[in-house]
Design a protein with these regions (language model features):
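The feature captures the conserved acid-bearing segment of alpha/beta-hydrolase catalytic domains
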Residues: 1-35
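Short hydrophobic segments within beta-strands
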Residues: 12, 108-111, 210, 375-378, ...
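Membrane/wall-proximal cationic-aromatic binding patches
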Residues: 77-109, 114, 128
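Alpha-helical cap/lid subdomain in secreted, periplasmic
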Residues: 122-138, 142, 147, 151-300, ...
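C-terminal catalytic histidine-bearing segment of alpha/beta-hydrolase fold enzymes
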Residues: 24-30, 34-76
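Catalytic nucleophile-elbow at a beta strand-turn-alpha helix junction centered on a G-D-S/GDSL motif
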Residues: 104-119, 144-148, 372, 381
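Residues that mark the start of a beta-strand
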Residues: 8, 104-107, 138, 372, ...
Length: 453
C-alpha cells in the first residue's frame, strides 16, 4: 500500500467534527498508517467558523500545505514498464472462461518462503477477486520455506492436485534452486516435473512462472549474464508455452534506473513491504494484460503437451508413506515427530509420522515402483550419514547434514537415484558410523519417501 511505498500523508482535521468523528476515522487511520511504516502529519484546524457540525472549516496556513507538497514531490519522470519483463507466450483464456462463465476458480501458489509469507500473493488474490467479482475462488497457498523445484515436484500431488482441478497456477523456485545447490539437470527435472505433472492433471490449466530476485542474480544481470536457474526454468517454460514474469531482471533494471535501491527499499530476497509492492504491481500488470480483450465467446482449449525435455524429469513425483518401509533393526516410527533438542523446524513437517534412527547400524528397506527414489528428511544438528543400496548393488553414502542443520531441522529433499528402469525396485538404507565433522550424531528422520513413477 501507500505506507509501504513511503508516501507521506498530511491530514487536515476539525477537532469538533461530528459528521466524520476523529476517534472513529482520522485517529485510527493515522495510527495504523504509522504502524505500517508510513509518515503521517496531522494539522488540526481550530480557527474560523466551524460549519456543518464541525465538518467544514477554513484551511489555516496554506503555505504549510504547499511546502509539504513541494518537499515531498518527485520530479516527473518515466518509470520502466513492467511488461518488458514478462514473457507472454499465451493468453490466460482458459482460466478467464472458467472465472467468467463457470463463476468458480481454484488458484494455487507454489514456491518457497517468498510465496508462503504474506505480501504479493495476498495482493494478487485481492486483484483476482476484484477483477472477477462474481466468481467464488478457492486459493491454495502451497508455499513452504526452503523449498524449490525438486521438492515442489514431489509435493505437488498431495499438496496441490489433491485439492481438485487447478485453473490457474503460480510457481516460483529460482531463489531456492540456487540457495539449495541443485545443479542444472536437477533444476530442469524439477521444474519440468511441476509443469508437466500439472498439465497432465488438467490440460486446461494456465500456468505462470515467476523468477524472484536475490543479490547474486542482480550481480549476474548487471554483468550481462543470465542466472543459470532462470535459463533452466525458461527452457521448461518455453517448451511448454508457459508465461513467465522475471522479477529478478525487473528489480535489477529498476535499481539501475535509480527508481529505488536494494539496501534502503527492497532490502532482502525476502522483500520488504515496498518490495512486495514491486512484485505485486508487476504480476498484476501481467494478469491485467493477459486477461485483456478476451472474447466472452471464446472456448476453452487444451494446452499442447509436448514430449518431455528429459524423460527422467519428476513429472510422476509423489510421496510414499514412511510406514511402507520394512524395519530390519534400530529404526522406529515416531507418530507425531517434533524436535526434542530445542532447535526449531518447519511447521508443515512436524507433528506427523517420521521414520527415525539415531545410531550406526540401523537398517530398513522399502519396495517401490518407479524411475527415481529419494527421501525427505528433517536435517538437524545430529544429522548423520546413510548408506543405501538398490536391488542389491554396492552401497553408496550420503551425508545428510546441511549448512543450516546446526540451527534448524530443515526439510531436505534428497533424490538418491533418478535414472532407474521404470519397474519395481528395493532400496536398503542403513546408518553409517561416519558423520559430518559438524554434526552431533548419527540420526536420520525420514518424513516421506520420494518416488517418481
Amino acid at each position: 500500500g501507500l505506507a509501504a511505498c513511503g508516501v507521506p500523508v498530511l491530514h487536515a482535521i476539525g477537532l469538533n467534527d461530528k459528521i466524520v468523528p476523529n476517534a472513529e476515522n482520522s485517529f485510527p487511520l493515522i495510527n495504523n498508517y504509522i504502524k505500517a511504516g508510513g509518515m503521517a502529519t496531522v494539522m488540526p484546524m481550530t480557527k474560523g467558523p466551524q460549519n456543518l457540525e464541525g465538518h467544514h472549516f477554513p484551511i489555516e496556513r496554506p503555505s504549510v500545505i504547499a511546502d509539504f507538497i513541494s518537499s515531498n514531490a518527485y520530479p516527473v519522470k518515466s518509470i520502466l514498464d513492467p511488461a518488458q519483463f514478462h514473457v507472454a507466450r499465451t493468453r490466460l483464456t482458459n482460466s478467464f472462461i472458467q472465472f467468467t462463465k463457470e463463476k468458480t476458480g481454484r488458484v494455487a501458489f507454489m514456491g518457497g518462503s517468498i510465496t508462503e509469507n504474506p505480501g504479493w500473493r495476498n495482493k494478487v488474490t485481492q486483484y483476482l477477486q476484484e477483477r472477477f467479482p462474481e466468481t467464488k475462488f478457492e486459493f491454495i497457498d502451497a508455499g513452504i520455506s526452503s523449498t524449490g523445484s525438486t521438492p515442489g515436484a514431489f509435493r505437488l500431488a498431495s499438496e496441490v492436485l489433491a485439492k481438485g482441478k487447478i485453473d490457474l497456477f503460480f510457481e516460483e523456485a529460482a531463489v531456492n534452486d540456487r540457495t539449495n545447490g541443485f545443479n542444472n539437470q536437477a533444476q530442469v527435472r524439477g521444474m519440468e516435473g511441476i509443469v508437466r505433472h500439472m498439465r497432465i492433471s488438467n490440460p486446461l490449466v494456465d500456468i505462470v512462472v515467476m523468477h524472484c530476485v536475490d543479490p547474486e542474480k542482480i550481480a549476474e544481470y548487471t554483468a550481462g549474464k543470465i542466472p543459470n536457474e532462470i535459463i533452466n526454468h525458461e527452457l521448461v517454460a518455453s517448451h511448454y508455452n508457459v508465461n513467465t514474469v522475471n522479477w529478478s531482471k525487473e528489480v535489477t533494471a529498476r535499481i539501475a534506473a535509480a527508481e529505488f535501491s536494494w539496501k534502503e527499499d527492497f532490502r532482502d530476497l525476502h522483500p520488504s513491504k515496498f518490495g512486495q509492492e514491486v512484485y505485486a504491481r508487476s504480476l498484476i500488470n501481467y494478469l491485467s494484460n493477459a486477461y485483456g480483450n478476451i472474447s466472452l465467446e471464446a472456448l476453452p482449449s487444451s494446452h499442447v503437451l509436448p514430449a518431455p525435455i528429459d524423460k527422467f524429469s519428476y513429472f510422476e513425483g509423489n510421496y510414499v508413506d514412511v510406514k511402507n518401509a520394512t524395519i530390519l533393526s534400530k529404526w522406529s516410527i515416531d507418530e507425531k515427530w517434533v524436535p526434542k533438542d530445542g532447535v526449531g523446524g518447519r511447521k508443515q513437517y512436524m507433528n506427523r509420522p517420521a521414520l527415525v534412527a539415531a545410531e550406526a547400524g540401523a537398517e530398513m528397506e522399502l519396495t517401490f515402483s518407479g524411475k527415481a527414489i529419494g527421501i525427505c528428511i528433517a536435517s538437524g544438528p545430529d544429522a548423520g550419514v546413510i548408506e543405501y543400496s538398490i536391488d542389491g548393488k554396492p552401497f553408496k553414502k550420503k551425508d545428510l547434514f546441511t549448512q543450516w542443520s546446526r540451527v534448524i531441522h530443515l526439510p531436505w529433499y534428497i533424490v538418491l537415484e533418478e535414472e532407474l528402469k521404470n519397474k519395481q525396485h528395493r532400496i536398503r538404507i542403513r546408518m553409517s558410523a561416519d558423520k559430518n565433522e559438524k554434526s552431533k550424531g548419527n540420526a536420520c528422520r525420514i518424513l516421506y519417501f520420494l518416488v517418481n513413477g
